[in-house]
Amino acid sequence: MKDVTKVALLIARAMCASSGTFVFELAFSITEYTGRPLGGGRSKYARRRRAISIARCHRCYRLWPPTVFTTRCDNKHCVPGISYNVRVAQFIDEGVTEVIPSVINKRE
């Protein structure tokens, strides 16, 4: 989770509103131990939708529909090659994660 401190501040603020004490260390440890939210865009449908949006295969990250030069992808039994574009693979698998900058990182 990239915005651990931002989520920890939100949890600490909610704890302060309900109990009256602001304990950031507890909120930070709660945030670290929680994983990615349930779902979170990691379904097969979401992967295929993101791959179609950038005209790539959701399995091997090659161009889809294939051109004359791309013959190894049939979109059913293909696998990633030895050197594939890691940024494209990360976008298809996880979605947009680094586009929105954190407000906390700007102040530091």
UniProtKB/Swiss-Prot annotation:
Keywords: DNA-binding, Host-virus interaction, Inhibition of host innate immune response by virus, Metal-binding, Suppressor of RNA silencing, Viral immunoevasion, Zinc, Zinc-finger
GO annotation terms (biological process): regulation of DNA-templated transcription; symbiont-mediated suppression of host innate immune response
UniProt keyword annotation of Repeat present: no
Region of interest called Basic, as start-end residue ranges on this chain: 47-50
Matches recorded under InterPro entries: Carla-bd
Record bears the keyword DNA-binding: yes
Molecular function terms from GO: DNA binding; zinc ion binding
Zn finger intervals (C4-type): 57-78
Function (record text): Suppressor of viral-induced RNA silencing. Increases the accumulation of viral RNA and enhances viral cell-to-cell movement by inhibiting RNA silencing.
Family according to the record: Belongs to the carlaviruses nucleic acid-binding protein family.
Name of the protein in its database record: RNA silencing suppressor
